[in-house]
């Protein structure tokens, strides 16, 4: 009797282990890191077909009209190191709107900068409260990450966050995007970015400017980190160059407009 019980327990334990491993593998396979291959001659990039479902979940990465010379400036701002104010000054000088995807930390430590973003006409958007990997969270935990930032922003500034979301580190899956969509968000990916995030290994300004100018394209959603000294140094020249090429700086709100 004891042997039979142990045998049954072992079978059940094995079955549960297999189910757990299969579920974990399936979940891991579904999780993806966003990327967009840069194209030459200012051509608009395409995305991997396995990522095309983002549109079904209120996601976007590039402007709708391939013939319109428009650029969307977006910034992932988790903290301040002296460069965000410089970025804001440059945007103001060019009357260019940006979308800032912020974390809880920035509101708590630098509310004056977030206030500037708001009062100077930029969109203040949701990059989650604590920059967690959303593909590893439950629906309830995802909701908590977004809604706690919403609440803090509302309590601090008396207004609602713009309902645009950017997944931390570009990590996503259908489940997380679907949860975000149900909360009323559009997920903003990007069509042009470069390695600007490491403050201890900043890109050469001339090379960074050339890369961005060589690969800009109609409808570009550009991701920049406003903590980057390189970005703060070159942004004025970039905006001037793009203006001279006939680009306008658009608002992410255009992505929510009906055709």
Predicted regions and their residues:
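N-terminal pre-catalytic segment of deacetylase/amide-hydrolase enzymes
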Residues: 2-74, 79-93, 207, 238-241, ...
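Enrichment for repetitive, rod-forming helical segments
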Residues: 10-14, 39, 134, 173, ...
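Metal-dependent polysaccharide deacetylase catalytic core of the NodB/CE4 family, i.e.
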Residues: 68-71, 81-83, 87-88, 92-223, ...
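Catalytic grooves of carbohydrate-active enzymes
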Residues: 217-253
């Amino acid at each position: 009797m004891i042997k039979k019980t142990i045998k049954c327990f072992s079978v059940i334990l094995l079955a549960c282990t297999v189910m757990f491993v299969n579920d974990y593998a399936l979940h891991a396979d579904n999780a993806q890191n966003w990327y967009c291959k840069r194209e030459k001659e200012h051509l608009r990039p395409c995305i991997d077909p396995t990522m095309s479902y983002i549109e079904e979940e209120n996601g976007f990465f590039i402007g709708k009209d391939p013939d319109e010379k428009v650029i969307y400036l977006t910034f992932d701002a988790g903290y301040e190191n002296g460069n965000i104010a410089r970025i804001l000054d440059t945007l103001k000088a060019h009357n260019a709107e940006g979308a800032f995807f912020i974390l809880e930390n920035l509101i708590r430590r630098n509310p004056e900068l977030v206030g500037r973003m708001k009062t100077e006409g930029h969109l203040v958007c949701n990059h989650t409260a604590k920059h967690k990997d959303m593909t590893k969270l439950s629906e309830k935990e995802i909701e908590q990450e977004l809604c706690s930032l919403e609440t803090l922003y509302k309590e601090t500034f008396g207004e609602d966050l713009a309902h645009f979301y950017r997944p931390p580190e570009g990590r996503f899956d259908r489940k997380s995007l679907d949860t975000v969509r149900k909360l009323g968000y559009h997920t903003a990916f990007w069509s042009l970015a470069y390695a600007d995030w490491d403050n201890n290994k900043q890109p050469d300004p001339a090379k960074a400017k050339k890369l961005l100018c060589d690969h800009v394209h109609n409808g570009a959603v550009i991701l920049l980190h406003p903590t980057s000294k390189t970005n703060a140094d070159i942004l004025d020249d970039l905006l001037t160059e793009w203006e001279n090429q006939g680009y306008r700086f658009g608002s992410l709100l255009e992505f929510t407009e009906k055709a």
